[in-house]
Amino acid sequence: MAKLNRKLRQDSTDRYKTKLYLWRNLGGLIPEDMAISVTESITADWKQYNDMMSKVRNETLDILKTNKVATEDYIGYIAFAEELAHQVWKNKNSSPDPNTANEASKTDLESKYSDVYGLDVTVLDAIYNAVIPIIMGGGS
């Protein structure tokens, strides 16, 4: 238990995730090494996803500044980028043909955001072209 307690003192995020895993699995009656390794694996997955989403947001902001988009419209474009990135992430991990699925997602989201929210299609295309390499290429 000392090893687990040392781990719990390191970081509040790890502490929370480890406790959550312990509480949800057999009332905490699992080996501590298993809890630690699973927590580290989950944390690594979340970190990879969150790092990619952060890159998507930063790239989107650069595109919006380059195209001189009004500041009040930023939230719509960022929402489009995040929703698109999430769809691309899901397609990458589950679809047999992610490129076709990505094009379908782009078409659906683009029509939604341009027709309903009145966003510029050329900016949406630029965001799409920036999001695809970030997510499909692993975040570069």
From Swiss-Prot:
Location in or out of the cell: Virion
Pfam families: MCP_C (PF21660)
Quaternary data: Heterodimer composed of major capsid protein 1 and major capsid protein 2.
One term under GO cellular component: helical viral capsid
Role noted for this protein: Self-assembles to form a helical, filamentous nucleocapsid mesuring 900 nm in length and 24 nm in width. Together with capsid protein 2, wraps arounds the DNA and maintains it in an A-form. Capsid proteins probably maintain the DNA in A-form by non-specific desolvation and specific coordination of the DNA phosphate groups by positively charged residues. This certainly protects the viral DNA under conditions such as the extreme desiccation of its host.
Domain remark in the UniProt entry: The N-terminus projects into a DNA groove.
Molecular-function GO terms, alphabetical: DNA binding
Protein name: Major capsid protein 1
Keyword DNA-binding on entry: yes
Protein's UniProt keywords contain Ribosomal protein: no
